[in-house]
Structure formats: C-alpha cells, structure tokens
C-alpha cells in the first residue's frame, strides 16, 4: 500500500496513487513509526477498510490482507502501541492522522485521511502529514459505495 522516500509516502489504491508528505518536526515518533512500517512492507496488501462519507477513509490494518478476517478488520495492529503526539495541527481535508481506540496512546499502524475538516479531532488525534498529490483519488475513495455506518462502514469493493 505505501512506499516511502524521505518525507513522503506513495499510497497505492484501487483508484490510483496518493502522495502524502510527513511532518517530522511536529510528530517525529509517529512519522518514524509509519515510515518503518511502510519500508518494512507492513502495509503491502492492506486496503482502506473503513470509509465514512464526508468524514474520512481509514486503512493500515494488517488483517485486511486476508478477506476471511473481514469480521475483525479495524482491530489489527503491529504488536505494539505508540504514544500520542498531539499538536496544534488541524484536521482539515487531506490531513493524515493516526487511528486509535478510546485510549489516546493506542495507535499503532492504522491511519486515516480526512475528507473534510474535522475540528472535533483536533488535539485528540495525532495528525502527522498531509496529502500533496491525488486529491481526486481521495475524493473518489470517499465516494465509493459502502455498507454499514460508523465503525462498520465498509466499502463494498476492496479499495
């Protein structure tokens, strides 16, 4: 799914490629973690498993590599958690942020990209980069047909 080079990553999807630029000066540990996972091919074969129209697309779960695990998608992790790195950065369209549970220090590998501003996440989720290429791809992913709502909002086709 992702390849990194310096401070950018290419995220390949069924709709095309998106390029995100990291903010290592804002969230160094989160950027380091994402880059390590991407460079170790951790994200290869994963998909965007949760799409909430008008909000965000979420990916990075290693369980999405196996369609037989679909009932558990959204629960996968790399075997560890990282500490939150909250900042003054805003969750606006195209911002890359870490997904987590209700525990602020529970992020590991799952991430999301905002489809529009989500100020209610500001200061509560670790945003660590932004989309610099592929806004049309982001919008296309955000418009795919999904089943379910909220936590269970899954694209009907693999993304």
Regions found by a protein language model. Name each.
Residues 1-159:
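Cyclophilin-like peptidyl-prolyl cis-trans isomerases
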């Amino acid at each position: 799914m992702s390849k990194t080079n310096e401070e950018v990553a290419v995220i390949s999807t069924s709709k095309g490629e998106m390029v995100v630029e990291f903010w290592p000066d804002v969230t160094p540990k989160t950027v380091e973690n994402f880059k390590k996972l991407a460079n170790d091919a951790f994200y290869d074969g994963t998909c965007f498993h949760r799409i909430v129209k008008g909000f965000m697309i979420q990916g990075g779960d290693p369980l999405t590599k196996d369609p037989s695990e679909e009932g558990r998608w959204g629960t996968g992790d790399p075997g560890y958690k990282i500490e939150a790195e909250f900042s003054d950065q805003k969750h606006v369209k195209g911002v890359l942020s870490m997904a987590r549970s209700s525990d602020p220090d529970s992020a590991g590998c799952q991430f999301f990209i905002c489809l529009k501003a989500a100020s209610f996440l500001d200061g509560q989720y670790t945003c660590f980069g932004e989309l610099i290429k592929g806004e049309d791809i982001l919008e296309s992913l955000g418009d795919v047909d999904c089943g379910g709502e909220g936590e269970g909002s899954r694209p009907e086709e693999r993304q």
